[in-house]
UniProtKB/Swiss-Prot annotation:
Family from the record: Belongs to the calcitonin family.
Keywords, in A-Z order: Cleavage on pair of basic residues, Disulfide bond, Receptor, Secreted, Signal
Compartments it resides in: Secreted
PANTHER family in the cross-refs: CALCITONIN GENE-RELATED PEPTIDE 1, CALCITONIN-RELATED
Superkingdom as given in the UniProt entry: Eukaryota
Species of provenance: Canis lupus familiaris
Reported function: Stimulates cAMP production in porcine kidney cell line LLC-PK1 via the calcitonin receptor (CT) but not via the CT-like (CL) receptor.
A molecular function (GO) term: calcitonin receptor binding
One Pfam family cited in the UniProt record for this chain: Calc_CGRP_IAPP
Protein name (record): Calcitonin receptor-stimulating peptide 1
S-S bonds: 83-88
């Protein structure tokens, strides 16, 4: 019911805005007076336009990155540095064996595996 009271004011407001916009429009020009050169721009205008576009693009990208960081901030898991050398792979496999052994209540970790095994073998070779 309130809509019928509001709609005449809405229509009058739209008409008033339309008339104001129409009256403020640029006056008509004759075809002989100063033909518009909309396709021709000087180099300075192009530089300013390019700078404005790049600035807006950078602001948009930084805003997107900030939003991604906010959403991923709660989901970020700690990642260890990966190592593909033979020593790292051997220690990784030893860790897997140790975990598998602890699940089965048996220790499957070989006696030659552990902390600084690689350095101990070097010392034995030098001696």
């Amino acid at each position: 019911m309130g809509f019928w009271k509001f709609s005449p004011f809405l229509v009058l407001g739209i008409l008033a805005l339309y008339q104001v916009g129409f009256l403020q429009a640029a006056p008509f020009r004759s075809a002989l007076e100063n033909p518009p050169d909309s396709g021709v721009r000087n180099e300075e205008e192009l530089r300013l336009l390019l700078a404005a576009v790049m600035k807006d693009y950078m602001q948009m990208k930084t805003h997107e990155l900030e939003q991604e960081q906010e959403t991923e901030g709660s989901r970020v898991a700690v990642q260890k540095r990966s190592c593909n050398s033979a020593t790292c792979v051997a220690h990784w496999l030893g860790g897997l064996l140790s975990r598998a052994g602890s699940v089965a209540n048996t220790n499957l970790l070989p006696t030659s595996m552990g902390f600084k095994v690689y350095n101990r073998r070097r010392r034995e070779l030098k001696a």
